[in-house]
């Protein structure tokens, strides 16, 4: 089977990896019943990742003739006698309009139909979303016969949702277990204090016999055995108190002393830290040259971007700066959108790798949303009008998750900045997100 490059502009590239079979046609019938059969239409359509009915219908629309594709037999017929070269030329136009990305030219696109019945091509190679000219005749046929939706993305998000629920249940179970252990430790520490107090009293009295020393601990053992009958699951406290040797009692005294001294050290060190924080706040966060103000951080991020830093390299450099996490994220957003006056959605798509690296840690999605809010709410910022598009782009790129977006939106409506226009501009995307969530739950 002879192969050719997909797209007329790539016909001379010997190393082009996107290929399709050369078209083979056959004239059938006579007189008024003459038809042109595109023999290998199914193979061509598979390489283009488009239904064969689309290409067949396109031939009919452009030639002004009836066309039919039989799904059962896989045959493609166009009424009339047509040369192979003519049909191949029409196929190239179809590829340019409905297959190739308008941005990078690669044929790795997927047809999307929006709620407004508009057709878009989403490129898997560069992420660019191309708007198809809806004046073409074939667009009506595509809207009425949409391609089969891949359930991969929905299944992926459903799996993520299930995984989050599982993690939440696990965290709740861990919290309950920690509470139980704390209660056991409190009981153990109180009984241990009683035991150590009695042992010190016995030492002062000079009772040197081992039996006198061990007599109070026997009573503790009996109390612990009764507690064990009530709760068989908590074994740690019982084992800790059953050891009544001299070394064990000394170890318990050391642990109690170390805990008390640790509290004393923490109390003494807290005050200087508070003073340092207060002084740094008064000086604008630039005390002794160990921390930097916000403007300096933004300038450094911009300089690193100009140097060609990658996402991981830039984020590792940013993480080392002695500034709060929210300021780092705000500086990153401001630097990435520098010089952008329009097309914030496209710019977000281009810089998605940086945003994805920035939200790698838990809780960082909320920081990114606050940074976007801060950037959009600046005076004379055109990004405020496109905030919904920015959120949609980050959501489609799996940078932001629906839970974080909805949580940020709901808190914003009740916060100090509730009168900002950002919430009104973001509302269409939030409504779409919640409707899509309810539809997926119903399915």
From Swiss-Prot:
Chain ranges of the W2 domain: 284-443
GO CC, any one term: cytosol
Pfam families found in the cross-reference section: eIF-5_eIF-2B, W2
Keywords: GTP-binding, Initiation factor, Nucleotide-binding, Protein biosynthesis
Region: Disordered, residue numbers: 147-244, 271-293
Single GO BP term: formation of cytoplasmic translation initiation complex
Binding site for GTP: 29-36
Residue spans of biased composition, Acidic residues class: 228-237
Residue ranges, compositional bias (Basic residues): 179-188
Compositionally biased tracts (Basic and acidic residues): 147-178, 207-227
Compositional bias of kind Low complexity: 280-291
Organism domain of life: Eukaryota
Sequence similarity: Belongs to the eIF-2-beta/eIF-5 family.
Function: Catalyzes the hydrolysis of GTP bound to the 40S ribosomal initiation complex (40S.mRNA.Met-tRNA[F].eIF-2.GTP) with the subsequent joining of a 60S ribosomal subunit resulting in the release of eIF-2 and the guanine nucleotide. The subsequent joining of a 60S ribosomal subunit results in the formation of a functional 80S initiation complex (80S.mRNA.Met-tRNA[F]).
The name this protein goes by in its record: Eukaryotic translation initiation factor 5
Provenance organism: Phaseolus vulgaris (Kidney bean)
Gene: EIF5
């Amino acid at each position: 089977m002879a192969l050719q490059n997909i797209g007329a502009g790539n016909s001379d590239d010997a190393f082009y990896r996107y290929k399709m079979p050369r078209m083979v046609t056959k004239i059938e019938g006579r007189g008024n019943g003459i038809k042109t059969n595109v023999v290998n239409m199914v193979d061509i359509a598979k390489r283009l990742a488009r239904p064969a009915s689309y290409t067949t219908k396109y031939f009919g629309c452009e030639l002004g003739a009836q066309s039919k594709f039989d799904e059962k037999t896989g045959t493609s017929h166009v009424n009339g006698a047509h040369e192979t070269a003519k049909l191949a030329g029409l196929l190239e136009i179809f590829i340019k309009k409905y297959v190739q990305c308008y941005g990078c030219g690669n044929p790795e696109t997927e047809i999307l139909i929006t709620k407004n019945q508009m057709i878009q091509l989403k490129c898997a190679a560069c992420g660019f979303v191309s708007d198809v000219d809806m004046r073409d005749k074939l667009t009506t046929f595509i809207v009425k016969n949409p391609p089969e939706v891949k359930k991969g993305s929905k299944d992926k998000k459903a799996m993520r949702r299930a995984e989050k629920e599982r993690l939440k249940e696990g965290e709740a179970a861990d919290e309950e277990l920690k509470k139980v252990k704390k209660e056991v430790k409190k009981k153990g520490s109180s009984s241990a204090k009683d035991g150590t107090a009695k042992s010190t009293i016995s030492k002062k009295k000079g009772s040197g016999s081992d039996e006198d020393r061990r007599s109070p601990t026997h009573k503790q053992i009996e109390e612990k055995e009764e507690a064990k009958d009530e709760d068989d699951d908590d074994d740690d406290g019982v084992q800790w108190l059953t050891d009544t040797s001299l070394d064990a009692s000394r170890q318990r005294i050391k642990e109690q002393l170390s805990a008390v001294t640790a509290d004393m050290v923490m109390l003494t060190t807290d005050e200087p830290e508070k003073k340092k924080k207060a002084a740094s706040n008064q000086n604008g966060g630039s005390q002794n040259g160990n921390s930097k103000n916000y403007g300096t951080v933004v300038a450094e991020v911009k300089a690193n971007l100009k140097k060609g830093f990658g996402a991981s390299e830039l984020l590792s450099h940013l993480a080392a700066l002695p500034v709060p996490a929210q300021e780092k994220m705000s500086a990153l957003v401001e630097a990435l959108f520098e010089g952008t006056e329009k097309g914030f959605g496209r710019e977000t798509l281009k810089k998605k790798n940086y945003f994805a690296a920035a939200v790698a840690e838990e809780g960082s999605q909320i920081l990114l949303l606050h940074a976007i809010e801060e950037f959009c709410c600046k005076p004379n910022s055109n990004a405020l009008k496109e905030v919904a598009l920015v959120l949609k782009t980050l959501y489609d790129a799996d940078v932001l998750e629906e839970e974080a977006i909805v949580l940020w939106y709901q808190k914003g409506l009740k916060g100090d900045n509730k009168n900002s226009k950002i919430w009104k501009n973001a509302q269409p995307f939030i409504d779409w997100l919640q409707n899509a969530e309810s539809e997926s739950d119903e399915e």
